[in-house]
Amino acid sequence: MKILVTGGAGFIGSAVVRHIINNTQDSVVNVDKLTYAGNRESLADVSDSERYVFEHADICDAPAMARIFAQHQPDAVMHLAAESHVDRSITGPAAFIETNIVGTYVLLEAARNYWSALDSDKKNSFRFHHISTDEVYGDLPHPDEVNNTEELPLFTETTAYAPSSPYSASKASSDHLVRAWKRTYGLPTIVTNCSNNYGPYHFPEKLIPLVILNALEGKALPIYGKGDQIRDWLYVEDHARALYTVVTEGKAGETYNIGGHNEKKNIDVVLTICDLLDEIVPKEKSYREQITYVADRPGHDRRYAIDAEKIGRALGWKPQETFESGIRKTVEWYLSNTKWVDNVKSGAYQSWIEQNYEGRQ
């Protein structure tokens, strides 16, 4: 099987590519624009494989997408290419509209034109797998807002869409496009919506890698608001396994939610990281003393939590990592891969960090 992966140099995309090349006999065509968050060093251990090809291209480039489909003749598409950071979407939404909505449209059309010319067997087996986020659902009631006797709700595959940020609105739009191409044109699509990912090779603008690296450098550990926002944390390699299971075994037209069963307050995640660093690389004072509370993000969702029962029941997937095992692996990875970290932390990254956090003190 040959799988066209978009965004395969990004955080989740590179985990998917590594999983496919290292654990299956399938081939990968990796299409990536190589924005600030795309890093080919994350694919160093698979880049020499005969089953791996890299295409430096923008999914918004229709002629390039048509050429790639015609040249490589994929059996499936896993569409992960996206702008994904909420803070960046607030200060610069245009890139999110262009990549996440227009780019998905261009890719859908390229896939549809290619798929329509396939023979019947290949048509039936072809899949267009669109990888999305639980943020399209908005947020859920927080424990502080409900009676303690009430069972807290979870996002399911039938939860209504209510995106809160430019990022989640752009992903919701792309989800709707993908489902429309299934209903209107018959393109065999699948959508997955995941909870917050963490793990190795994560670009250090997101909470967990930012906290690890700031802690090690003696910098402040910025916490939005009171830090009581709750997220369901999914180890990225568990997610990669789930995505491969969906593209190879999932049913066209279906949606599958993918979660880690690990609801944690942001402040508790940060405290856990500090305690691990105190254990592994102790210093005179606890890393907890570097925690600093900053102004909250505009429209910050208070709680996300995924009901992943469907994918477990239908496809037999479940996460292998607990949060405790996964976060330890993550901290140890960053401690052991300082060269990768140094290479991704460019001047542009430093400027963005200063712009985003200094104004929130």
Swiss-Prot record:
It is an enzyme of class 4 (lyase). InterPro entries: dTDP_Gluc_deHydtase (IPR005888), NAD(P)-bd_dom (IPR016040), NAD(P)-bd_dom_sf (IPR036291). NAD(+) binds at residues 11-12, 32-35, 58-59, 80-84, 99, 167-171, 197. GO terms for cellular component: cytosol. CDD domains: dTDP_GD_SDR_e. Signal peptide: none annotated. Catalyzes the dehydration of dTDP-D-glucose to form dTDP-6-deoxy-D-xylo-4-hexulose via a three-step process involving oxidation, dehydration and reduction. Belongs to the NAD(P)-dependent epimerase/dehydratase family. dTDP-glucose dehydratase subfamily. This is dTDP-glucose 4,6-dehydratase 1.
